[in-house]
Design a protein with these regions (language model features):
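Residues forming the flavin
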Residues: 1-574, 578, 583-585, 589, ...
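Divalent-metal-activated hydrolytic enzyme cores
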Residues: 664-702
């Protein structure tokens, strides 16, 4: 460490930290460490005065590294962003939230833990490297796949920023399913009004190129420079396939708006669809009422059956979101045509969020009868009527009504276009075949950088939500519609001298950011990479490291960790905490003054899936008593599968420990959400007690 100059700075946080930690003692010890050129203590390092002092030292003393022992690295990020030195050569040491505040009742142990953390951080920073953002040329052209209302609106919004747009549609015409509708809800205006305006804007905008009868043939490239091969069918392509047109589009971003398809109720034979002509679907209703002027006057008694195929494990297990409102709208149209029309809606649950409750109230006021119960049978009664039999769960009796028309409220399912694109582009879909990412945090993303979803390819939704999602997707795409894109440099790096080309990194990368070079070695596309670190955790040879956290750094930190920093009888735990949830829960424990034992040293990782089994095994082999990996619950993982992979890998380590006659309980995984500081503290307490019962790690050398 003598070849570099390190500045070590302690913040007292206006005296708070000195109440629990002997900072003067730590500062004196730090000044004697190899490579440490200056040690300072300041009551408020994040103040202008404190920041200025660090900058002055960097300039005058020629510091190569800066270590700040203060609050959590999750805090004050802007204040410490520019210290006059490459930000990747600055190390934040959390001695407040996860040390002084969590162990304020035991200053001696808090100081010992702070000393251990400081030593590990100094070792880590020794291996830190200056990294610079990478700038990559890009194009201001977007590709929008799907010509329904979502795709059209996304194209118009993007073109409005000055970018060029290619809008491709599989069918010979634009408009999607909306072009088949009779009326929108809640205003009950005709879709033709909005569509004609959209078509006019498309036609008049020279930046938008519309390609109908077109499909994606092949797809390659990266965000900013996707290469997409498009085939456009000619009108006589059946007779002369060679007349099909082929072109390649270079696009900076892609909007996926591949729409939806209606559920086919034919398998539900109890409803007679396809057998009884008086039984139609809700989409059939739209088409007939739009095309046949007298349709709404023909039926004097009409029954709507909700959830046909939806919320049914045999067919569509999910709610399709729009069906209740569609039936209420259609029922109101019947009442508008003839107020004496008898209308029944058979339902499981009526779902009318927000202002849509007004339409539900209007429907009840107009005399539409709502009967809670799903009909068991629909049959012809011999007199030209359709008999609908249902058990009314509110009245507690079976009811049968004779009607002229039955409308089945069928749900939405993912389109064939989405399924086809899944294979062509390499999309990730959920179990229902809708395009998926992290629904809570990144609902418009597709798990593929530079590709965003709009409309019903993501989930069932109505027209207004589809248009809303299109605008949001267009806004997110703008980042990639630039002359050049700047990429964070902390993406993973592969050491090809260690790599045996096993392909594990490629298989487990949730962003599909890996490909292989001409020699078969993995290479990462920095534009596709989300820097989750799952590839680093996957490599059985430890050949992959992140720019900001390397295998070498982690191994070095283990070497300098005092395995008995609290005393010979106290277990030492090494904790790997995911930065999005578990680490923040640990910080919150400190902020709330929640006490827990000082036996754990935590290392923040981008995802629990970034922890390599080699490091876990190395920690145990070097005498650490226990290793805890804490990450998001599976359903909340920001990188979809990181937590699940971490648990699988940890199970493998446990089995190896058994073979070594070492207790497998020395490694464990904990699911801890961002808002569970109490659970975090309780987890540490329980683990410390369990390790005390197990006794000292037999590999610990005193």
């Amino acid at each position: 460490m003598s070849d570099i100059k390190v500045g070590v700075y302690f913040c007292t946080c206006e005296g708070e930290l000195e109440k629990a930690i002997a900072l003067d003692s730590l500062a004196q010890e730090a000044s004697g460490r190899p490579g440490v050129a200056v040690v300072r203590k300041d009551p408020s390092l994040c103040s202008e005065r404190g920041i200025g002092a660090i900058r002055e030292d960097v300039k005058k003393l020629g510091l190569d590294r800066v270590l700040i022992a203060a609050c959590s690295p999750s805090l004050k990020t802007k204040e410490f962003a520019d210290l006059g030195i490459n930000k990747y050569l600055v190390e934040r040491v959390n001695i407040r939230e996860q040390c002084s505040r969590s162990h304020a009742g035991n200053p001696s142990n808090a100081t010992k833990k702070a000393r251990a953390i400081l030593g590990m951080s100094l070792e880590k920073i020794r291996h830190s490297k200056a990294l610079e953002p990478v700038t990559i040329p890009a194009v201001k052209t977007a590709l929008v796949v799907g010509g329904g209302v979502a795709g059209i609106n996304a194209a118009l919004d993007i073109a409005g920023t000055g970018a060029e747009v290619f809008l491709i549609e599989k069918k010979p015409f634009l408009g999607g399913k909306v072009s088949e509708l009779h009326r929108y809800y809640p205003r009950l205006c005709p879709p033709s009004c909005g569509l004609e305006l959209m078509f006019s804007r498309l036609e008049s905008d020279p930046r938008i190129h519309v390609l109908t009868s077109s499909e994606i043939e092949s797809f390659s490239g990266s965000p900013g420079n996707f290469s997409v091969s498009i085939m456009t069918s000619s009108s006589d392509a059946i007779k002369s396939p060679e007349k099909n047109q082929h072109r390649t589009i270079i696009a900076g971003a892609v909007i996926l708006a591949t729409g939806w398809e209606p559920f086919d109720p034919t398998p539900l034979t109890e409803y007679g669809y396809g057998r009884l002509e008086q039984v139609i679907t809700n989409l059939d209703f739209e088409k007939r009422s739009r095309e046949q002027k007298q349709f709404l006057d023909q039926s004097k008694k009409t029954a709507f059956i909700q959830c046909v195929g939806s919320r049914d494990e045999r067919h569509l297990p999910y709610c399709s979101d729009v069906c209740c409102m569609v039936s209420i709208k259609q029922a109101l149209l019947l009442k508008e045509a003839d107020p004496d029309n008898e209308v029944y809606i058979f339902y499981n649950d009526i779902r009318t969020p927000g202002e849509y409750e007004d339409m539900y109230r209007q429907a009840r006021t107009s005399g539409i009868k709502f009967i809670k119960g799903i009909p068991s049978e629909v049959r012809q009664d011999g007199q030209g009527k359709i008999g609908v039999s249902v058990f009314d769960t509110i009245a507690g009796e079976r009811t049968e009504v004779a009607v002229d028309l039955v409308v089945l409220a069928t749900g939405m399912k993912a389109s064939r276009g989405t399924t086809e694109l899944k294979n062509t582009i390499g999309l990730v879909t959920n179990k229902y075949n809708f395009i998926e990412s992290h629904l809570q945090c990144h609902p418009l993303d597709s798990q593929r950088e530079g590709m965003f979803t709009a409309g019903c390819c993501r989930a069932p939704m109505d027209v207004s939500r589809s248009i809303e999602s299109a605008g949001a997707a267009a806004a997110k795409a703008l980042r990639y519609l630039q002359d050049e894109i700047t990429v964070s440099p902390d993406y993973p790096v592969v050491d090809i001298l260690k790599c045996d080309r096993c392909k594990r990194c490629m298989e487990e990368c949730p962003s599909k950011a890996y490909s292989f070079d001409e020699k078969g070695f993995p290479k990462v596309d920095s534009l596709k990479c989300r820097v989750c670190g799952i590839c680093m955790g996957s490599c059985p040879l430890g050949a992959i490291s992140l720019g900001e956290l390397s295998i070498e750094q982690l191994s070095g930190m283990l070497d300098v960790l005092d395995k008995s920093y609290l005393g010979d009888d106290e277990p030492v735990i090494l904790g790997f905490l995911c930065k999005n949830d578990a680490y923040r829960a640990a910080d919150d424990a400190g902020l709330k003054g929640i006490r827990y034992p000082s036996n754990m040293i935590s290392i923040m990782v981008p995802c629990s899936g970034a922890v390599n089994s080699m490091i876990v095994s190395e920690a145990i082999s070097k005498g650490v008593d226990g290793v805890l990996i804490a990450g998001c619950p599976d359903s909340q993982c920001h990188y979809i599968q990181g937590s699940a992979l971490a648990k699988t890998r940890l199970a493998d380590v446990s089995n190896k420990l058994k073979d070594m006659y070492i207790e497998p309980e020395r490694v464990r995984f904990a699911s801890i959400s961002r808002d569970e500081p109490e659970k975090f503290a309780e987890t540490i307490k329980e683990y410390v007690e369990e390790l005390k019962k197990l006794g000292k790690n037999p590999l610990r050398i005193i």
